[in-house]
């Protein structure tokens, strides 16, 4: 679970990187589709799945808006993300095993923000993204 220090670290780091959300989301989603090709099945309705394509860029931004929303609801992720959990469970039917983007977001943070993404920030962001994935999985139980 997230300590008070983790929450402070996540909020502080997010305030530094959120202005680059579109680029972070595009790169993270592009990487996910390459590294975890099985995730492409959820996006088969898109005309183009290549890294950096318009649909990938657009959905990457959507994902990062969700991450930003989660940062603002960090005190109670499960309640705060219930609507998003229901969407993924009942409408999109995404298997929680395919919530693979968080690892790619961490990679992109490390690449884009090498000075700011310290080991301490890495640990807190990893814990936060794991908590976010658990909150999104809530409606699958």
UniProtKB/Swiss-Prot annotation:
Claim: Nuclease is one of the keywords in the record: no
Keyword Thylakoid found: no
Residues of the Globin domain: 1-141
Pfam families: Globin
UniProt xrefs under SUPFAM superfamilies: Globin-like
Tissue expression notes: Red blood cells.
Stored CDD domains: Hb-alpha-like
Gene Ontology MF terms in the entry: haptoglobin binding; heme binding; metal ion binding; organic acid binding; oxygen binding; oxygen carrier activity; peroxidase activity
GO cellular component, one term: hemoglobin complex
A GO biological process held by the record: hydrogen peroxide catabolic process
Transmembrane segments annotated in the record for this chain: none
UniProt-listed InterPro entries: Globin, Globin-like_sf, Globin/Proto, Hemoglobin_a-typ, Hemoglobin_oxygen_transport
Residues at which heme b binds: 88
Protein residues bound to O2: 59
Keyword terms: Acetylation, Heme, Iron, Metal-binding, Oxygen transport, Transport
Modified residues annotated as N-acetylserine in this record: 1
Assembly information from the UniProt record: Hb2 is a heterotetramer of two alpha-2 chains and two beta chains.
Recorded family membership: Belongs to the globin family.
Note: This fish has two hemoglobins: Hb1 and Hb2.
Task performed by this protein: Involved in oxygen transport from gills to the various peripheral tissues.
Record's protein name: Hemoglobin subunit alpha-2
